[in-house]
Amino acid sequence: MDKFQRDGKEYTSRQRRFLYPFLFKEDLYAIAIDHYFNRSSSFEPMENSSSNDRFSFLTVKRSISRMRQQNGSIVPFVNCNQKKLVGYNRSFYSELVLGGLTAVPEVPFSIRSKHSLEGMNEWTSFRSINSIFPLMEDKIPHSNFILDIRIPHLTHPEILVRTFRRWIQDAPFLHSLRFVLHEHRNLIISSNLDQLILIASKENTRLSLFLWNSYAYECESLLVPLWKRFSHSRSLPYESFVERTPFCRKIEHIIIFSHKYLKKSLWFLKDPSIHYVKYRERSIIALRGTYLLVKKWRYHLTNFWQCHFHLWLQPYRIYIDELSNNCFSFLGYLLSVKMNTSVVRIKMLDDSFITDLITKEFDPIAPTTLLIGSLAKEKFCDISGHPISRLAWTGLTDDDILDRFDRIWRNIFHYYSGSSKKDGLYRMKYILRLPCAKTLACKHKSAIRVVRERFGSELFTKSFPKERESIFLSFSKTRSQRERIWHSDIIQRNPLVNSWWKKHNFQIEPLFDR
């Protein structure tokens, strides 16, 4: 793969990103075959020992050539030689070609994205989910509104082709990609839609993920330069308004921003407090200003994406939340900004007086009620939080039962260790402790009291290791009880978070601001 990437870098720089010949490189499909057999567990038509011997690279070449000579046929492998498909179904060669169409543009896309981010400290990408929260902890308290954006998954195939045309000048490759996007609806296109393509499909194929990431990157690529130019723009000169002092003081904080993709100049208040974070299809833009200003930002962002990227993002998909009054959900947390009031005595030379000092604090909270609902859905408790035994696990050994409950609690506590309130987490621990004891009691046909006497301190103590407990206790002694610990080794959402997030995120969206 490294050799393929080196060849891709040299070829792209010399031939101006002509990628179609790479589809006929045999090394590419050797990688695709390894990926196919490592991923697929249901491939049974032939023995693994002879699988690589029966692969025909000539069939792949003919399939790619026929893709550009189709007459409306959905499957481009119908006319292939049936003898060369012995031991393989047509979906195997179809997946190989799709893998090639995915792997080839990944190389110039990675080079292009890396080159565009050089010297731009405002735009950083992290693997850890929790790396987002320290940024929000520092920046969001200085903002008073957020734009909660839900990026749609559906778009037209031609929009994706036009997106790739901005950085790929290879017409044959684009024709092949267009054919795949229009015809392979069973892999990356929703079955109940005729014209729209589902970018992030349920199968999460490599091609659908690449299409989603590249399209989202294109939509975000101009945000940082736009905001950077906006925040560093000079104020409007006001020498001609010398006699109108009040108007001068107001207009010096106004800038006029024009862009080559916009037909009109945009007037905004000059305020550099704009922060942007994204995880998958959720994007958060934190702003400081009035409600009218935030509505203007939503209007102009919607028009900008529609005119330039054909991203039909309806205004009701961009929620406006006021941080001082509302909380919003992001990555399984309920986030808000809390106002803290402290009494301060100010001493002057001749007198002293008492005043109130108001500070803003970022307040992430674990949604205990929603997590209990997820546990109820997984049959660990009922909807009110009363524990239920897991009868399906009674056939396992005692260590396996303990390890499974330990793993569930460890993941919950590890993920929500940054919560400002730990009471809900210990309630979750109590809910999981009783199902563990009840499951062991059902297995041994005894009472819960007997199980506790038998296992003693080993029951449900593996989930809170001594080293982690000592770290947490030492941190609590030296710091405030509301200080948070963000673990940088978390790279995906908690499974319980995914269950309630899907229900919360894909409900019917309101037509008005929250």
UniProtKB/Swiss-Prot annotation:
Subcellular location: Plastid, Chloroplast
InterPro entries cross-referenced by the UniProt entry: Domain_X, Maturase_MatK, Maturase_MatK_N
Keywords: Chloroplast, mRNA processing, Plastid, RNA-binding, tRNA processing
Top-level taxon in the UniProt lineage: Eukaryota
GO annotations of cellular component type: chloroplast
Segments crossing the lipid bilayer: none
A Pfam family hit: Intron_maturas2
Keyword flag Membrane: no
One MF term in the entry's GO annotations: RNA binding
Major subcellular location class: plastid
GO terms under biological process: mRNA processing; RNA splicing; tRNA processing
Family statement: Belongs to the intron maturase 2 family. MatK subfamily.
Cited function: Usually encoded in the trnK tRNA gene intron. Probably assists in splicing its own and other chloroplast group II introns.
Descriptive protein name: Maturase K
UniProt source species: Zamia integrifolia (Coontie)
